[in-house]
Amino acid sequence: MDKVSADPENNEIYLAIAFNKILVFDREASGDTAPKRVLAGPDTQIRFTEQTVGSGDVLPVRVDPVRNLLVVKSQGLNRGDPGALLIFDRTASGNTKPLRVIKGPNAGIGGGGQIQITPAGWIVAGSSGGSIGVWNIMDNGDVPPKWRIPVLKLTGVGVNGVAIDSIHKEVFVPSGNGNTVSMFYFPEIF
């Protein structure tokens, strides 16, 4: 479900699909329903890898209902290029430019497909070097993460995603290659 984000406050569902699009549906829609909004086009900078089989390598999308924002993890233009975190107004549609873009060598957007947004406004996502990085939702440009968890160094296994537990102030990092879930107490981001 990391390719789908539900926004219970605004009663919407966001779905990232191949062909570099974000579809927005009414949460209560059923049947063959057209999306209420589509975010797509070259100005959006939304890029997923080429679709070859199945759904391709579609990256996650998350809604921040507190700040009325949408965060999309995008890939570089070419294979191996660093990725980006694209921050849009939640209601953006069409070929809309992001409000802010976090990308570049210092930003180090990297592996681990999932992203999360904490209630305090921190984006938690995969970072370079087998780590999890934490950026402020107001960051823009080639901004290094405020904090980094060096998961690979600490556990010996790579990053496959991220989940957060706001109640216990923890970050969970699963790893398929080690069949493990590592848990980190991280009160600073909650």
Predicted features along the sequence, with ranges:
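Conserved beta-propeller blade signature
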Residues: 12-15, 69-71, 122-125, 170-173
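Blade-level signature of beta-propeller repeat domains, shared across WD40, Kelch, NHL, RCC1
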Residues: 160-190
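Short loop/turn segments immediately following beta-strands, especially the blade-tip
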Residues: 24-32, 87-95, 134-142, 184-190
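Beta-propeller fold detector
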Residues: 33-43, 96-104, 143-151
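Short loop/turn segments that connect beta-strands within the blades of beta-propeller domains
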Residues: 9, 18-19, 66, 81, ...
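Beta-rich, blade/repeat-based domains predominating
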Residues: 1-8, 42-65, 75-77, 105-122, ...
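Structural signal for beta-propeller blades
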Residues: 21-23, 79-80, 85, 131-133, ...
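Short loop/turn segments immediately following the C-termini of beta-strands
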Residues: 17-19, 27, 74-77, 90, ...
